[in-house]
């Protein structure tokens, strides 16, 4: 979607150009999911790129929706930062390890447990 909205064809080397274009158009935060490769975020203060969680993917049908939902939950509590992106990235990673759409969406406890196993920080409370 970021490529379509910005009018710039996506390549591995032009994420920053796409993000800059969207920021200039008035967006506060640009978040681009990269599938198994992770997530890229840019705003006027910082740029963050996280690798994807290594999992055995079974069905990717709900990955994007799960990522967006998880990020929205965090954004209700705090600004987008590395911890927020890790939370959403983790939720999506868990989702792809299961079949189906709605049944694949993890619970909050499942995401917290996975993050703890992977030693990913989670300092905010829900």
What are these language model-derived features?
Residues 2-6:
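A short acidic, helix-capping loop that chelates divalent metal ions and anchors anionic groups
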Residues 7-8, 12-126:
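Conserved phosphate-binding/catalytic region of the ribokinase-like
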């Amino acid at each position: 979607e970021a490529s379509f909205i910005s009018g710039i064809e996506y390549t591995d080397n032009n994420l920053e150009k796409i993000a800059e274009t969207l920021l200039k158009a008035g967006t506060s935060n640009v978040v681009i999911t990269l599938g198994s490769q992770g997530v890229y975020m840019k705003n006027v203060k910082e740029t963050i790129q996280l690798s994807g969680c290594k999992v055995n993917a079974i069905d990717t049908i709900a990955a994007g929706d799960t990522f967006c939902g998880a990020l929205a939950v965090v954004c209700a509590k705090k600004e987008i930062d590395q911890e927020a992106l890790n939370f959403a990235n983790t939720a999506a990673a868990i989702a792809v390890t299961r079949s189906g759409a709605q049944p694949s969406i993890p619970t909050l406890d499942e995401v917290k447990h996975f993050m703890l196993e992977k030693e990913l920080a989670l300092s905010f409370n829900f």
